[in-house]
């Protein structure tokens, strides 16, 4: 496929590849395809790729790259740029990213989702309809950010979209599932935030003692599964 992009230098050990400005699943899919292909076909000095909504940052060891400079190229950036452009040109039309499917149990409403009724009212739906729509979707992890392991998820139905709270909460419990605009996400740690809270998961999305420390990674497919309050507490007891 023809991949359109722009490459910018970031300091002396990184570059950013921009694939557009519009946030959608097609562009984000290209970001993850590029990241996966570069990781499968690393160039000398490659360290890692960090995908975002519409861009990919590639980190490299400039000293290692310098050791392998091709004839006629004088800088590590130009060498990496050439290597990256070659790989982007090689991405096949049918190249597919190996995506994991991760199910996240959620207890909706009540003390776990204090804004569920507000989201329902905004969209002229019942709370049950909001839950049904939310659990029937498949969500792509566009990127991790804001807080350690916080997944920005694409693919949510417009039918349950809701604006951020006018006044952010000073502290949102870890595991809270929220909606902001056309996105849904899960708070991995306790932090201030302004998303509309519709439920809570007993799973720990950020586990600093483990490797990797995050449950999710960019490119994953997330499915939310409704559970009862009893099941929620059972999950918590098992994890403790």
Swiss-Prot record:
ATP binds at residues 194-201. Its EC number is 3.5.2.9. GO terms for biological process: sporulation resulting in formation of a cellular spore. Keywords: ATP-binding, Hydrolase, Nucleotide-binding, Protein kinase inhibitor, Sporulation. It comes from the Bacteria. Disruption phenotype: Deletion of the gene enhances sporulation. Deletion mutant grows less well than wild type on minimal medium with ammonium as nitrogen source and cannot grow on 5-oxoproline. Mutant lacks 5-oxoprolinase activity and accumulates 5-oxo-L-proline. It catalyses: 5-oxo-L-proline + ATP + 2 H2O = L-glutamate + ADP + phosphate + H(+). Transmembrane segments: none annotated. Induction: Induced by glucose when readily available sources of nitrogen, such as ammonia or glutamine, are scarce. Transcriptionally activated by TnrA and repressed by KipR. InterPro entries: CT_C_D, Cyclophilin-like_dom_sf, PxpB. GO terms for molecular function: 5-oxoprolinase (ATP-hydrolyzing) activity; ATP binding; protein kinase inhibitor activity. The keyword Zinc does not apply. Catalyzes the cleavage of 5-oxoproline to form L-glutamate coupled to the hydrolysis of ATP to ADP and inorganic phosphate. In addition, is a potent inhibitor of the autophosphorylation reaction of kinase A (kinA) and its reverse reaction, but does not inhibit phosphate transfer to the Spo0F response regulator once kinase A is phosphorylated. Is an inhibitor of the catalytic domain of kinase A affecting the ATP/ADP reactions and not the phosphotransferase functions of this domain. The inhibition is non-competitive with respect to ATP. Forms a complex composed of PxpA, PxpB and PxpC. Interacts with PxpC (KipA). Interaction with PxpC prevents the inhibitory action of PxpB (KipI). Interacts with KinA. Two PxpB monomers bind via their C-domains at a conserved proline in the KinA dimerization and histidine-phosphotransfer (DHp) domain. Belongs to the PxpB family. This is 5-oxoprolinase subunit B. The lineage of its organism: Bacteria, Bacillati, Bacillota, Bacilli, Bacillales. The gene is pxpB.
């Amino acid at each position: 496929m023809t991949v359109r992009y722009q490459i910018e230098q970031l300091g002396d050990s990184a570059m950013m590849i921009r694939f557009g400005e519009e946030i959608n699943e097609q562009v984000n899919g290209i970001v993850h395809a590029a990241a996966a292909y570069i990781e499968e076909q690393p160039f000398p000095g490659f360290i890692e790729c960090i995908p975002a909504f519409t861009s990919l940052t590639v980190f490299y060891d400039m000293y290692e790259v310098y050791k392998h400079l091709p004839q006629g190229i004088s800088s590590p950036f130009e060498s990496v740029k050439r290597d990256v452009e070659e790989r982007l040109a090689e991405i096949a039309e049918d190249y597919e990213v190996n995506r994991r499917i991760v199910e996240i149990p959620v207890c909706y409403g009540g003390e776990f989702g204090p804004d569920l009724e507000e989201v329902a009212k905004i969209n002229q739906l019942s709370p049950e309809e909001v839950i049904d729509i939310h659990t029937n979707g498949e969500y792509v992890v566009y990127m991790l950010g804001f807080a350690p392991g916080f997944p920005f998820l694409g693919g949510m139905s417009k039918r349950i979209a809701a604006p951020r709270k006018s006044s952010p909460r000073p502290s949102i419990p870890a595991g809270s599932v929220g909606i902001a605009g056309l996105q849904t996400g899960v708070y991995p740690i306790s932090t201030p935030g302004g998303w509309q809270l519709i439920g809570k998961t007993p799973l720990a999305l950020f586990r600093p003692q483990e490797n990797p420390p995050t449950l999710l990674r960019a490119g994953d497919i997330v499915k939310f599964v409704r559970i009862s309050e009893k099941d929620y507490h059972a999950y918590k007891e098992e994890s403790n």
